[in-house]
Amino acid sequence: MRTRTIFALGLLAAVTSASAQSAIDAYNITPTQMRGTARFVGMGGAFTSLGSDLSCMTQNPAGLGLYRHSDIGLTFDISIRNYAAQTETQKNSENETRVKFDNFGYVGVVNLSGAMNTFQWGVSYNRLAVMDRLTSGYNLGTSTSLSNYIAWYTNGVNSNDLLEDGDYDPYYNPDNDWLSVLAYNSFMINNPGSNLEEYSGLHQRGTVGDALYNVRERGYTDEYNIDFAGNISDMVFWGLGVGIYDLNYTREANYSESMSNALVYDHQIRALGSGNAGFNLYNWQAISGTGANLKFGVIVRPVEMLRLGFAIHTPTWLHLSHTTYGETSYNYTPDEAEGSDKTNSGDFSTPDNDYDSRLNTPWRFMVGASVVIGPKAIISLDYERVAYNDMKLKRQRYYDYDSFGGGYVDNTYANEDVKNYFRAANIIRVGAEYRINRNWSVRAGYNYQSSNVRKEASDGAMHISTAGTDPSYRFDNDTQNICLGLGYRYKAWYIDLAYQHTRQTGTFHAYTPFGESNSTLSTPQAKVTDKYNNIVISTGFRF
């Protein structure tokens, strides 16, 4: 079964099935993070024009061409994290510590005669991204309800199509939105009169309500690289690499509301009336996948002290498998109801929803320049552009709600959302290294990444579509990394240490703003700030 939900400002164009991947899914699983060896991190990742580091295989494979000796090494990091969410009335903060194994690699060097002095090859494992984070908060005095949002976009759908009844399962009606089905069978939305295509939510004039949310995300992106490089006359260094991706992401979200003077369904008289209302919406999502990309790079050394670098990464062509599940629990107590059974409570859930999709991540282009000041110092500068608005999503071809054909076709609506929500990210990396003596080096770096989200989307000026029954989403602002490093060499052995402070802010939305364009309702949200203090340790041996 396939689902898509299409929104426009003030007008619902169409609502169909809930099991197509969304632009938000693509955004959640494609973060660009600065991760690598301790030397790489200590210099802010500014290695597009540098080399002789195992992290070159994930950035510019031409950097392998500068190796004179074979190298084997590994890296791990200790990450101390703080997640904070600030609403108008509350602030919530959580801490956690994680230890990760980030990198293992080997580079072999073959000496040649002729114009190409050396040929290098390398293999490596790299943890490119960690998607672990926690967002939790509490909004007092909400001005609307998730139920009102669902009622707003469900208007026009006959309630007989949403109701589970005997052998009829509304989830297998391809015209139904799964969140509408979940809400109607949980009495979150109701028909206020005899019109079966009109709906009301729980929030009415005079309702007082609060909202609570907790979203736990976990995941990673790993890349396995096979790279080849060469050195032509110690002036031109080329590199070509193949990256194999392994991706895993889970998202567990709870959203609760409690209200007094709400518009609730009185099951004794089968009519609506004022009362107390409470519900919890639980969602679980898992995305796993594999993919591949290609990388090509060049480093040119026109004079001894100057190096210029360029690298291009193709999209990563990903094959993804999705699983989603949603569940509600509810409790409504009408003011005028009598007897011990006056409370209407229960729960309702979706079936497990499994489907596959395709995702092409953006192209990546990077340029860099570095100055080598004698045997003592290096200063390096990089620029990278990642066009997130060019991501492409594909869904399985299907003939009807339970019959899939072969192959994949463009997910037209999700691809339109990608262009509406996202833009290109610009990344600037600056790094420096100073060699104190033959054994010790100190390093510093700065890494800045602009937000890849359009201002209209992050500010809540447009409706945001999500897949499945989880309406929540988060958009991040700019990301900054400040880095320091220390290196020690003894004969063929080396050990490097780096400290990385990352600060990322953003906005969490429990669900999208909705309503007519001139009267859009504000929904529960929080300003979020994530801070990471990472200690990165690398060790290796050159021979």
Task: Go through the PLM ranges and name each one.
Residues 21-35, 40, 109-543:
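Outer-membrane beta-barrel porins/channels
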Residues 7-8, 13-16, 50, 81, ...:
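A broad, structure-centric signal for solvent-exposed, well-ordered loop/edge residues
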Residues 38, 50-59, 65-142, 219-222:
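Outer-membrane beta-barrel translocator/receptor signature
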Residues 1-26, 539, 543:
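Bacterial Sec-dependent N-terminal signal peptides
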Residues 59-60, 296:
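A generic local structural motif
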